[in-house]
Structures are given as structure tokens and as C-alpha cells.
Curated annotation (Swiss-Prot):
Homodimer. SMART domains: CoA_binding (SM00881). This is Redox-sensing transcriptional repressor Rex. GO terms for molecular function: DNA binding; DNA-binding transcription factor activity. NAD(+) binds at G92, V93, G94, N95, L96, G97. It comes from Geobacillus sp. (strain WCH70). It is found in: Cytoplasm. The lineage of its organism: Bacteria, Bacillati, Bacillota, Bacilli, Bacillales.
Amino acid sequence: MNNEQPKIPQATAKRLPLYYRFLKNLHASGKQRVSSAELSEAVKVDPATIRRDFSYFGALGKKGYGYNVNYLLSFFRKTLDQDEITEVALFGVGNLGTAFLNYNFTKNNNTKIVMAFDVDQKKVGKEVGGVPVYHLDELENRLHEGIPVAILTVPAPAAQWITDRLVQKGIKGILNFTPARLNVPKHIRVHHIDLAVELQSLVYFLTVDEHFSLQ
């Protein structure tokens, strides 16, 4: 993100790409302005939260008018560094890793997986989704400073060991899909996504909703 942007809550930062994607669709349809209520309906975030999110960046809209789509799109493009491609390395070409390589963020043109690593000799030296797969032993030789982000879809026991090597190579951010909780220096940002935990959480809330609907 732009170094000049204000410090904002993590929850707000996570919603910015949602706003940006919807604004791109609005712009493509030729719409010139949008209200917080319309944004709310599209991204499933209440209008008050949207207005609060936008307030961190100053006056982005006018009361009674709403928001100028072109202006917002341009603003968030700069805020999210959409004009620059962020190269990503993926570790672990199993089922989940293969799905990532085939998808490769086709709806997000500024993010691209450019290389993958695995230890399976049947996968090493080949391409998956047009992305070359290297042996994990080649990490130090292949990974360069232009790749700031790594995705981990490896077995949990290997996650910390690979992370330590990534830190040594100057990686800045890790999207961790393993159950392992990684130990990294403070300047490294890690987002943990445990699919089992997310599913259990969803099932829990479904159970709670069903309980209250029966009362």
C-alpha cells in the first residue's frame, strides 16, 4: 500500500479490496456516483461502517450526493497500489496449492504467483497453471527481492522451517494456510487462514442461528 496513507484499523484495511472491486464493476457499467447504501447492499457491510472506513482518508464524498465513482476508484487504486504488480511465491503444490496456481488471482490483476516450490519430483520442473515449480532446495537461489509475499500451503511441520528461510531472504508478508502458528520478526506480517477453524466457526454460528430461530 501507499506509504503516505494514514494508519487504519486492520478490519478497515481488509474491506478496502471489497470496495475497490465493486467500484471497478460500477465504473465498467458507466455509473458515475454511488451512495453508501448502495455500497452497503453490494459488499454486505453496513452504511455506517463504510462511512467510518472512508473517513480515515478524509472527505471522499458529499452529504446528499454520495461518492463519485471515478474519484473513489482512482483513490483506492493508488491506496492499494493497483498500478503495480505484486509478485508472489507459493510453497506446497498439493491440492490447495494447485488450485491457487490455476486460479492465480485472475480477478485481481495486480497480484500474480510467479513461482512455486515443492519437494515432489513428479511436480518439480513442470508448470502448473503456467507457473514454474521448483524444488524447495532452490528457494535461496530462486527467490529474489522483487517477491515480497509468500503463500504457504505446505504440511504444518514444514511451515516454520520454510518461514525461517523466507525471513532470511527478505520476505515481507506471508499468507499462511497451515494450522501452524508462525514465529516471525515484528516487521514481517503474517495472515493465518485455517480453513478447518473457519468451517467450525461457520457451523457454530449456523447452530446459534437455528437455536434462536426456534425460540
